[in-house]
């Protein structure tokens, strides 16, 4: 038995800013096959998408010391009486000491064209060895790549003001994720009331990321855009920029899970995972992650038969530990680089720094662990017309991964990435679903949700690394009070600190 499905979709949307659009093509195919009296099941899925974006190069950058926050920001803050065009039809620009560029001019003088490709393919084979016992193999690959062409014309505000006469940049990245998973699943029922399922498995994930970019400035013409990077004068002067990098990491897991259900009244589940990642130090790549949960369908008990309030009433509780991965795959290793170098005005060339350490190694870097405790009730009343859930939870994150000042000597670099700190989240969640009106021809339902959470950074220090708070971000001008966002022990994440105003000086 074989069945298949295929789809193709095309969509184009124009942006709210002139000369901007997004064009998308999506295609997919799915094939399923059964054989040997349905004991063997095969499935294959393939999905591909192509996206083309015409945008405005509107990244946050700087002209001199003045930040540029983009076209929409500039359209709001600029003098509304400033003209858009000069009498000769060219764009009006003030070239003042402030970043008061013409937002309409930027639409036409800066372009950013992006092309995205996404490929997702997976294959699964499952075979029933004996009744109740199945084995499965799963293979998947996801591949994303993007090409960006970014060009600023010679007369564009920042180029003309800085005398750089045009800027062209090409950037490409590719992200690949491969997954292999093997599982064995067993389920059985004893006397129709004892229902048992079990799972054993192994998974392997491989991540690979590559990026390349090249940028040049000082062009004689805008005709070529980003298609003739070598024509820019910065390349001859040794000031053109090129960057590339490649990152790889692996994640391996062994796991097991068991579920038990007695006659729909009592439920219990337990699982264990042993996971290892190349992102952690040599001494702590592996960690255990257990979980347990239980449920009690109170409304099915004999003593509940005489009551008429609850149609459904279920109690449940669970506790589990999960792990978090750092974003950078090399935080535990000693990496080296040349630094940014410097421009030598006397020789007219770049001075390149020699190779030196970028970070200190930490062979003891380990998993962040998230401990979660959840207790809740599910209920139904009024013949099923009112249903809801209520939950209380407590989540504690231990061994937070962060950067701390390092002792010099003996360490080479002045900071180190390590595990310090604890954060706690506690809260209540309530969800209600009511069938307010239900007739033959009309029905009306209402939903209500409520949540409350208390967050606290309980610790930022240990016996070796000390910190009571860490300043993060500034507030924007005017009236910048300095660092206003702070991580501080005993306070919630995202706490704001600033001067206390006593009033206005008359």
Residue positions per predicted region:
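Short strand-turn segments of transmembrane beta-barrel domains in outer membranes
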Residues: 1-20
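Feature captures outer-membrane beta-barrel proteins of Gram-negative bacteria and organelles
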Residues: 27-32, 288-296
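Solvent-exposed loop/turn segments connecting transmembrane beta-strands
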Residues: 16-18, 278-283
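Surface-exposed loop/interface segments of Gram-negative outer-membrane beta-barrel transport/assembly proteins
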Residues: 16-17, 26-118, 138-252, 300-371, ...
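Transmembrane beta-strand segments that form the barrel wall of outer-membrane beta-barrel proteins
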Residues: 8-12, 268-277, 319, 435-436
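Structured alpha-helical segments in the cores of large, soluble enzyme domains
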Residues: 252-262
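Glycine-centered tight-turn and secondary-structure capping sites
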Residues: 374-376
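Alpha-helical support elements that line or immediately flank enzyme active sites
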Residues: 121-127, 139-143, 379-381
């Amino acid at each position: 038995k074989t069945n298949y499905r295929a789809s193709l979709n095309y969509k184009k949307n124009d942006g709210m800013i002139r000369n901007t659009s997004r064009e998308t093509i999506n295609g997919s195919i799915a094939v399923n096959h059964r054989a040997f009296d349905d004991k063997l099941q095969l499935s294959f899925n393939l999905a591909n998408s192509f996206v083309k974006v015409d945008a405005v190069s509107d990244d946050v950058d700087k002209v001199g010391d003045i930040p540029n926050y983009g076209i929409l920001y500039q359209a709001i803050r600029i003098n509304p009486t400033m003209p858009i065009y000069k009498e000769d039809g060219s764009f009006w620009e003030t070239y003042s000491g402030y970043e008061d560029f013409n937002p309409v001019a930027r639409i036409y003088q800066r372009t950013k064209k992006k092309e995205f490709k996404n490929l997702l393919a997976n294959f699964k084979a499952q075979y029933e060895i004996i009744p109740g016992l199945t084995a499965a193999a799963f293979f998947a690959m996801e591949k994303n790549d993007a090409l960006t062409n970014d060009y600023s014309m010679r007369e564009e505000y920042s180029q003309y003001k800085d005398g750089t006469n045009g800027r062209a940049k090409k950037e490409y990245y590719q992200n690949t994720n491969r997954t292999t998973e093997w599982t064995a699943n067993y389920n059985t029922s004893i006397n129709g009331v004892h229902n048992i399922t079990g799972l054993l498995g192994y998974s392997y994930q491989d991540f690979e990321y590559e990026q390349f970019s090249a940028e040049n400035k000082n062009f004689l013409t805008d005709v070529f855009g980003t298609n003739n990077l070598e024509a820019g004068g910065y390349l001859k002067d040794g000031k053109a920029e090129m960057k590339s990098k490649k990152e790889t990491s692996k994640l391996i897991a062994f796991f097991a899970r068991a579920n038990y259900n007695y006659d729909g009244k009592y439920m219990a589940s337990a699982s264990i995972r042993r996971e290892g990642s190349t992102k952690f130090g040599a001494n702590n790549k592996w960690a255990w992650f257990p979980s347990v949960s239980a449920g009690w369908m109170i409304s099915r008990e004999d003593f509940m038969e005489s009551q008429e309030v609850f149609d459904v009433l279920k109690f449940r509780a669970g506790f589990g530990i999960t792990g978090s991965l750092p974003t950078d795959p090399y935080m535990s290793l000693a990496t080296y680089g040349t630094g940014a170098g410097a421009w030598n005005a006397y020789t007219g060339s770049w001075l390149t720094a020699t190779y030196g350490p970028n970070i200190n190694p930490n062979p003891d870097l380990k998993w962040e662990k998230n401990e979660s405790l959840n207790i809740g009730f599910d209920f139904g009343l009024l013949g099923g017309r009112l249903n809801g859930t209520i939950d209380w939870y407590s989540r504690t994150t231990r061994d937070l991964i962060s950067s701390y000042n390092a002792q010099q000597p003996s360490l080479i670099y002045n900071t180190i990435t390590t595990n310090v700190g604890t954060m706690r989240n506690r809260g209540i969640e309530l969800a209600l679903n009511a069938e307010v009106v239900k007739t033959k021809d009309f029905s009306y339902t209402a939903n209500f949700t409520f949540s409350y959470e208390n967050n606290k950074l309980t610790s930022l220090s240990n016996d070796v690394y000390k910190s009571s708070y860490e300043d993060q971000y500034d507030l924007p001008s005017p009236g910048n009070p300095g660092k206003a966002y702070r991580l501080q022990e005993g306070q919630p994440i995202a706490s704001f600190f600033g001067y206390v105003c006593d009033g206005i000086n008359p």
